[in-house]
Structures are given as structure tokens and as C-alpha cells.
Amino acid sequence: MLYLTKIRNAESEFTENEQKIADFLRANVSELKSVSSRKMAKQLGISQSSIVKFAQKLGAQGFTELRMALIGEYSASREKTNATALHLHSSITSDDSLEVIARKLNREKELALEQTCALFDYARLQKIIEVISKAPFIQITGLGGSALVGRDLSFKLMKIGYRVAYEADTHVQATVSQALKKGDVQIAISYSGSKKEIVLCAEAARKQGATVIAITSLADSPLRRLAHFTLDTVSGETEWRSSSMSTRTAQNSVTDLLFVGLVQLNDVESLKMIQRSSELTQRLK
């Protein structure tokens, strides 16, 4: 019996940790080549032995055997599906009904949120919030879908009184980066962590003495190595994607948490500014 089928059939018997492992494997089956049991254990907040026992429960000798089998099953399934239906996004195909599409999208986003939240180091997050709160100036960088997340964060921070520079144009991003000073903060948003424009800006910011905070994936990347602080995000999207939907969901969960943490840090004044902003925009209607 195929391991994916075994996972589905045994789901009612899984413990909480086993369910976490099962959800992770199904959501990230296309990326398992680069996943070790150690990395997975850290990401899910469980022990490596739990992952090995899960593999053995399904009939594999260990995680490596299970991982390789799942990779093979995924490749075979992809070839079969590709021959009969068009991939529209992630696991969604042209054969799916709107109801099925809705369920798949919802689950994809749920998993991105669950797995991203499971990674939070709250002590480090509090430190990052304090660093941002003391920054005289904040620059936010990002490309594509990450740029949309960056723009949203910039609007939120400006609303509560922070001096923020956000500009989608990469030349402007680079220009602002080289003008940062010690004490300033650059928030770089990039899931891959390898976009040359974002890496260039991070290098420039570090050279000027600014603090670089990266919102990125767990993968080793140039941005991750440059950053003073990292906030990890997880997305189960495969190569079959039409847009970075669950990636943006994960990134937004991080930026929203940063915003609320900053509001909490200076709650009275922040709430006054939010109220004034609301009153002003109401007058524009």
C-alpha cells in the first residue's frame, strides 16, 4: 500500500504529534528532498524520535525510507495527473470543482499559518519588536507578492507614528538602503531569501550599520546569512503555483503579529493615532 494512502487510512488513530507530522508531509511532499528529520522536528516543535516512530508505525524502517517513498509517490502522481488535467495552482487541477478548490485553498492557508506559528520563538520576537520600536527610521523591502505584504506593513506602521520607507521600485529600494544609519532598521521580506535585489539592499543596509530583519523561509539563503534577526515562514506551495497565496498568508501572519506587538508596546498613544486615522478617513467618505 502507498504511504500517502496509509497516512489517510490511519489518520483517526494519530496522536497530536503524529497528526502534525502527517499534515506536514502531505503539505510539503514536493519539497521533501531538502527536509531532514532534524529540520522537520525543529519546525514542528517535536522530537526527532517522534518522526522516526511515525515512519515505523507506517511500516518504514525510518524517516529516510519514508521520505524517499513519498518523493517517489509524488513524482508518479504528478506525471499521471499532468497527463490528464492541467495544474492551476499547487494541488488544484482543472478537474476540480469550485467546492474542492475552496477546500484545498483553505487547507493550504491553514497549514501555512499553523506551521509558521509553530516556529515562533517568542522571546526573539519580543526582542525584534523592541528593536523596531526604537528605530528612528524603518525601510521595508520586497518583490512581487512579498512587496504587497511589505506595503501593507508600511501602512500599518505609519498609522501608529513610525517613519517608514516603502517603495516597490527596486532602484529606489537600493537608494534608500545605502542612506540608512546605525539604529535604523531594514525589514526584508523574501520567501526564497535569494532575490538579488533584496540581498543587495540587505548588504547595503548592513554596511551602513542598520539592523536587518528578514522575514523568510527556513532554507539557508544569502538573506538569512546577512540578517541580524530572522522571522521564519512556512508555505506548502509546490512548483505548480499560479500565485504565492499561502506564502503571503504566512508572511502576513508575521507582519500582523509585529504590528500588534508594536501597538501593545505603546498602547495608549498607538490607539489614539489609530482612532485619529479612522476619524480622518471617515471624513473622506
From Swiss-Prot:
Looking up InterPro entries in the UniProt record yields: Homeodomain-like_sf, HTH_RpiR, RpiR-like, RpiR-like_SIS, SIS_dom, SIS_dom_sf, Tscrpt_reg_HTH_MurR, WH-like_DNA-bd_sf
The protein here is known as HTH-type transcriptional regulator MurR
Q: Please give the coiled-coil regions recorded for this protein.
A: none
**Which Gene3D superfamilies does the entry link to?**
Glucose-6-phosphate isomerase like protein, domain 1, Winged helix-like DNA-binding domain superfamily/Winged helix DNA-binding domain
The segment(s) forming the SIS domain are 128-268
| Residue ranges occupied by any HTH rpiR-type domain in the UniProt entry | 1-77
The UniProt entry, under PROSITE patterns, shows:
HTH_RPIR (PS51071), SIS (PS51464)
Show the GO MF annotations.
carbohydrate derivative binding; DNA binding; DNA-binding transcription factor activity
Could you tell me which pathway this protein works in? Answer: Amino-sugar metabolism; N-acetylmuramate degradation [regulation]
What GO biological process, any one, is recorded here? regulation of carbohydrate catabolic process
Q: Which residues bind DNA?
A: 37-56
Q: Which UniProt keywords apply?
A: Carbohydrate metabolism, DNA-binding, Repressor, Transcription, Transcription regulation
Q: What does this protein do?
A: Represses the expression of the murPQ operon involved in the uptake and degradation of N-acetylmuramic acid (MurNAc). Binds to two adjacent inverted repeats within the operator region. MurNAc 6-phosphate, the substrate of MurQ, is the specific inducer that weakens binding of MurR to the operator.
What is known about its subunit structure? Answer: Homotetramer.
What CDD domains would the database entry show?
SIS_RpiR
